[in-house]
Amino acid sequence: MSMQDPLADMLTRIRNAQMAEKSVVSMPSSTLKVAVAKVLKDEGYIAGYEVNGEAKPQLSIELKYFEGRPVIEEVKRVSRPGLRQYKSVDDLPKVRGGLGVSIVSTNKGVMTDRAARAAGVGGEVLCTVF
């Protein structure tokens, strides 16, 4: 079976692993997944990540918990292959009044909505995390 939306698969694996209280989740690696994992790490939603293997690289994400509860309460895919969501810098969404983040793919790389506003660029809204 071919994977139609690898990023949605990544987010689902993270969500399922946190519900099962796993400490680490692994998945096939890609450039986009590593960029999203870097943003999640920089924002403090995951403890860490690493890419293992040469021929078929695997991305391992170390999940983060606070007082026994997952740090990521909600993660949603916004732009999907069947309906891409592109937003200008003025239209970038705020998640829960600025408490969460939107992860945006811009021509300057994958970044949070706050960083995109600061850089003055819009792009494809990949997902929201709270």
From Swiss-Prot:
GO terms for biological process: translation. SUPFAM superfamilies: Ribosomal protein S8. The keyword RNA-binding applies. GO terms for molecular function: rRNA binding; structural constituent of ribosome. InterPro entries: Ribosomal_uS8, Ribosomal_uS8_CS, Ribosomal_uS8_sf. Belongs to the universal ribosomal protein uS8 family. Part of the 30S ribosomal subunit. Contacts proteins S5 and S12. This is Small ribosomal subunit protein uS8. It comes from Ectopseudomonas mendocina (strain ymp) (Pseudomonas mendocina).
